[in-house]
């Protein structure tokens, strides 16, 4: 694009500048900006207004406007000034070639302040890209608790049960992302631990925001408990079984194409994670007498050999013990 704004005028805020800004203290209207060592919001507004609406609405070969580019680079002052103009032309949700609005671009770039600004200016909070992913899906996919916090603090209603084109809610997406971060990988352990921590935080935040833990993904009817068990993640299983709402026994015995979480746990490779998960499920009221579509009980899905023999005896005892007495 010709005569585009020189984005070098709008450096990304330093951590100290970001830290001095507080969402909770904002009134409606323009954000209260710290005193940065660089251009102010008024300076950004002057440059944006000088460009005129034609250049602000122009899209490059990938469909990006200047607002998309500012959001992607974390150029907050320029993004806010550009968004004000696009708001006047009802183009705040203009899409690039993958269907991403500036809000979705800001979320993917992990720019929670810009996410907060765009929402305050009227960006559509439930907009989705060409994969059906909302701002919550994006934050869940990449493990971005700051973005989730920005959405939550905005006070704007968002659809926590929205489905992407894979049939996943943001909570399903967050659990799958957490499971992936905990798999053995070539990345350094410190980076892997950081990813897992952020993604676990996203799971917890979505639950606190009111996401339904009983929602089933469309393709195979799995709940987040099934997904956690399938990934042999005893820590997450224990967290989900400790949720303080709903009928725990009904939740733990929900079926995904005929299989309960206990069926899936019994089919895991033998080892400490499997044993911990089976014990957690039984303690929460999992019914070892339920059968799947192949008429199998969980005990029938244990792998042969001496490894799972202790679990075999436990499941057999639990089939005849009164509820709550299995151990």
UniProtKB/Swiss-Prot annotation:
Hey, what tissues is this thing expressed in?
A: Specifically expressed in spleen and at low levels in thymus. Expressed in a population of antigen-presenting dendritic cells which may act as regulators of systemic inflammatory response.
**Which PROSITE patterns does the annotation name?**
ANK_REP_REGION, ANK_REPEAT
Designated name of the protein? NF-kappa-B inhibitor delta
Q: Name one GO molecular function term.
A: NF-kappaB binding
Ranges where the record places region Disordered:
1-40, 293-327
Phenotype upon gene inactivation? Mice are highly sensitive to LPS-induced endotoxin shock and susceptible to intestinal inflammation caused by exposure to microflora. They display no overt T-cell selection phenotype but an impaired proliferation of T-cells. Thymocytes and T-cells seem to produce less IL-2 and IFNG.
| Family designation | Belongs to the NF-kappa-B inhibitor family.
* Taxonomic superkingdom: Eukaryota
Which Pfam families does UniProt cross-reference here?
Ank_2
Q: What induces it?
A: Up-regulated in thymocytes upon TCR-triggered cell death (at protein level). Up-regulated by IL-10 or LPS.
Q: Describe its partners and assembly state.
A: Interacts with NFKB1, RELA and RELB; in the nucleus.
Q: Does the keyword Nucleus apply?
A: yes
Question: What does this protein's UniProt record list under function?
Answer: Regulates the expression of IL-2, IL-6, and other cytokines through regulation on NF-kappa-B activity. Functions in the regulation of inflammatory responses. Involved in the induction of T helper 17 cells (Th17) differentiation upon recognition of antigen by T cell antigen receptor (TCR). According to PubMed:11931770, it may also regulate TCR-induced negative selection of thymocytes.
> From which organism does this entry originate?
Mus musculus
Keyword presence, Membrane: no
Q: Name one GO cellular component term.
A: nucleus
Q: Which UniProt keywords are given for this protein, alphabetically ordered?
A: ANK repeat, Inflammatory response, Nucleus, Repeat
One GO biological process term is: positive regulation of T-helper 17 cell differentiation
Where found? Nucleus
Each ANK repeat, start to end = 62-97, 98-127, 131-160, 166-215, 220-250, 257-290
> Which stretches does UniProt call biased (Polar residues)?
14-23
């Amino acid at each position: 694009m010709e005569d585009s704004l020189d984005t070098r005028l709008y450096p990304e805020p330093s951590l100290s500048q970001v830290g001095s800004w507080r969402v909770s203290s904002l009134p409606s209207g323009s954000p209260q900006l710290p005193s940065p060592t660089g251009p102010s919001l008024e300076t950004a507004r002057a440059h944006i207004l000088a460009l005129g609406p034609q250049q602000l609405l122009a899209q490059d070969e990938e469909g990006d406007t200047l607002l998309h580019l500012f959001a992607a680079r974390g150029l907050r002052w320029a993004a806010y000034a550009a968004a004000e103009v696009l708001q006047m032309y009802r183009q705040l949700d203009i899409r690039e070639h993958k269907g991403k609005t500036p809000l979705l671009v800001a979320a993917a770039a992990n720019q929670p302040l810009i996410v907060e600004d765009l929402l305050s200016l009227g960006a559509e909070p439930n907009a989705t890209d060409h994969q059906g992913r909302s701002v919550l899906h994006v934050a869940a996919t990449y493990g971005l608790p700051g973005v989730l916090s920005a959405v939550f603090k905005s006070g704007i209603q968002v659809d926590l049960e929205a489905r992407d084109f894979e049939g996943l809610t943001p909570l399903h997406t967050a659990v799958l992302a957490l499971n992936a971060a905990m798999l053995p990988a070539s990345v350094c352990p410190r980076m892997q631990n950081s990813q897992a921590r952020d993604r676990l935080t996203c799971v917890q935040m979505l639950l606190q925001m009111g996401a339904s833990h009983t929602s089933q993904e469309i393709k195979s009817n799995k709940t987040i408990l099934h997904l956690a068990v399938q990934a042999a993640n005893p820590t997450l299983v224990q967290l989900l079984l400790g949720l303080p709402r709903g009928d725990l026994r009904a939740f733990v015995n929900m079926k995904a194409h005929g299989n309960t979480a206990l069926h899936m746990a019994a089919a895991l490779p033998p080892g400490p994670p499997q044993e911990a998960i089976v014990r957690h499920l039984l303690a929460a009221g999992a019914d070892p007498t339920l059968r799947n579509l192949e008429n199998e009980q969980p005990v029938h899905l244990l792998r042969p050999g001496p490894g799972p023999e202790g679990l075999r005896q436990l499941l057999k005892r639990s089939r005849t013990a009164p509820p709550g007495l299995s151990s």
